[in-house]
């Protein structure tokens, strides 16, 4: 009996000891919340255009804002989504400038503007820190008077403030960058598609590597290469050769090596800067040898494809318009003419040639002409008929003003572009006037203006590749002609008056 009682007491004491021990164990600590700063400063600068990009242009749509995390649907939107999926991440918006008026029709950014917005970002980082990481949504083709490599300079200044924490950068496919940027940042991710469908995806990738790096699960190592090639934007579409094959090669490396990120920027040829041209940037998890091997492979491949880029030819204005009219007469409507070389938006070469060759049922979408808009607003209302000169004055390659005798079909504010006017003239012809360069990418642009684009014979767009999103890949366009009219965005890069680019870059200087 005593033995049984003893055993029971011993068992109870043993169980109590277990309960006591478990109760005394320290409650597991929750993983520390991660705090990441998010900023944006983005511009694609066509340095050959006549008008500098000033503070006034940057603040046309409003002053700098910290609300970028809630309003962005591209890189920052993807970054935010991935952070939410990981959990335990707090994002802090940093005072960032909005998009500049005129976009890439603006020339050199003034040093005053660059310093104002860079200093604003740096000051916010100082005052709102400390942070565990910094995410910068940049473009890569920014050009600033007096600052040769502005994005790299921005990242260096951020580094000086935040110290040795991860700085992750996203760039546009048209970026002009080199090792100075990758030396200052920890990881760089570049859009792989043109049209740029994957900005959201690149933001997600940036967040994944950022969080893994902060938690010690990833150690980003980079390799950067410059193949020494510049290419016209009109030939950089990733749905056609050779850009398609180059991007497929990059994706193949990523498939073979999980955790490796291979980025290619084809560059922006219309910025006269020292780091112009294609760039390859590879991020690996602590594997420099692999990063170097992949970067060398992609860079060498781009160099081997250089003549495919340079060998492409486009019809000049007269031939291109004749081809478009013939296609329309054959029933391949709507015919799309891509007036790709017009970088200021006010060129009249295609409009003038359409009229000269007797084209009907066409629409110019759009023609930049603030002067004509002001005159029409003063003298006319919707339904009024008038005669007015349009276009042909924005730059030396804008052509001649074209006299239009027509009717005001639409007059009003439209999609934050300012006052927009549609002039109807001739046999169902239209020209859409806007106060700034407008790149129409989808057919729904025409709907609020009362234009049924499907019923047009010919539609002229001031675009290079982005229009393919809504007119080619949807099957809307019967046929497309890219017309090489005079302008600051030509297919023949040897025609541009470069001063600052490398003296061995292909095809401008290096011929073999």
Locate the predicted segments by residue.
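Active-site histidine-anchored catalytic micro-motif
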Residues: 37, 42-44, 48-50, 58, ...
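Hard-cation-handling environments
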Residues: 34-36, 231-428, 432-434
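Cap/lid and interdomain-hinge subdomains that line or gate substrate/regulatory clefts
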Residues: 86-95, 142, 161, 168, ...
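Bacterial Sec-dependent signal peptides at the C-terminal "C-region" and cleavage site
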Residues: 17-32
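Bacterial N-terminal signal peptides that target proteins for export
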Residues: 2-12
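N-terminal amphipathic/basic leader segments beginning at the initiator methionine
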Residues: 30-86
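Extended hydrophobic packing segments that form well-structured cores
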Residues: 93, 119, 303-306, 416-512
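Glycine-rich phosphate/diphosphate-binding loops that line cofactor/substrate pockets in enzymes
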Residues: 29-32, 85-86, 123-132, 320-335
């Amino acid at each position: 009996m005593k033995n049984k009682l003893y055993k029971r007491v011993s068992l109870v004491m043993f169980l109590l000891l277990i309960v006591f021990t478990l109760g005394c164990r320290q409650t597991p600590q929750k993983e520390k919340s991660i705090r990441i700063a998010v900023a944006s400063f983005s511009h694609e600068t066509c340095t050959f255009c006549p008008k500098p990009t000033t503070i006034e242009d940057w603040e046309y749509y409003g002053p700098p804002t910290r609300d970028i995390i809630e309003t962005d649907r591209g890189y920052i939107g993807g970054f935010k989504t991935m952070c939410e999926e990981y959990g335990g991440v707090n994002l802090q918006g940093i005072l960032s400038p909005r998009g500049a008026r005129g976009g890439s029709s603006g020339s050199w950014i003034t040093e005053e503007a660059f310093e104002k917005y860079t200093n604003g970002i740096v000051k916010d980082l100082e005052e709102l820190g400390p942070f565990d990481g910094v995410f910068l949504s940049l473009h890569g083709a920014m050009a600033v008077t007096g600052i040769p490599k502005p994005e790299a300079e921005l990242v260096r200044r951020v580094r000086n403030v935040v110290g040795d924490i991860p700085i992750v950068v996203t760039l546009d496919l048209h970026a002009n960058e080199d090792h100075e940027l990758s030396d200052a940042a920890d990881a760089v991710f570049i859009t792989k598609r043109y049209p740029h469908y994957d900005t959201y995806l690149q933001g997600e990738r940036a967040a994944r590597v950022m969080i893994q790096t902060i938690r010690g699960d990833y150690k980003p190592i980079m390799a950067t290469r410059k193949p020494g090639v510049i290419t016209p934007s009109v030939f950089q579409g990733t749905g056609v050769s050779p850009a398609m094959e180059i991007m497929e090669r990059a994706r193949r490396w990523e498939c073979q090596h999980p955790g490796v990120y291979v980025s290619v920027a084809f560059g922006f040829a219309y910025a006269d800067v020292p780091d112009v041209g294609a760039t390859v940037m590879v991020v690996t998890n602590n594997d420099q040898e692999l990063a170097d091997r992949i970067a060398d492979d992609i860079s060498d491949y781009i160099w081997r494809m250089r003549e495919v880029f340079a060998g492409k030819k486009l019809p000049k204005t007269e031939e291109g318009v004749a081809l478009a009219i013939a296609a329309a007469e054959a029933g391949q409507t709507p015919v799309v003419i891509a007036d790709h070389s017009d970088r200021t938006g006010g060129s009249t070469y295609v409009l003038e040639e359409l009229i000269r060759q007797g084209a009907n049922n066409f629409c110019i979408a759009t023609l930049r002409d603030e002067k004509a808009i002001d005159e029409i607003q003063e003298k006319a209302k919707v339904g009024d008929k008038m005669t007015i000169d349009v276009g042909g004055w924005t730059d030396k390659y804008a052509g001649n003003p074209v006299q239009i005798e027509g009717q005001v079909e639409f007059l009003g504010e439209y999609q934050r572009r300012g006052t927009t006017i549609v002039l109807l003239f001739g046999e169902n012809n239209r020209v859409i006037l806007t106060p700034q360069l407008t790149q129409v990418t989808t057919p729904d642009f025409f709907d609020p203006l009362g234009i049924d684009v499907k019923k047009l014979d010919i539609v002229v767009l001031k675009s290079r590749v982005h229009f393919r999103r809504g007119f080619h890949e949807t099957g809307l366009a019967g046929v497309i002609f890219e017309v090489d009219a005079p302008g600051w965005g030509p297919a023949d890069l040897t025609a541009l008056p470069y001063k600052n680019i490398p003296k061995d870059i292909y095809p401008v200087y290096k011929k073999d």
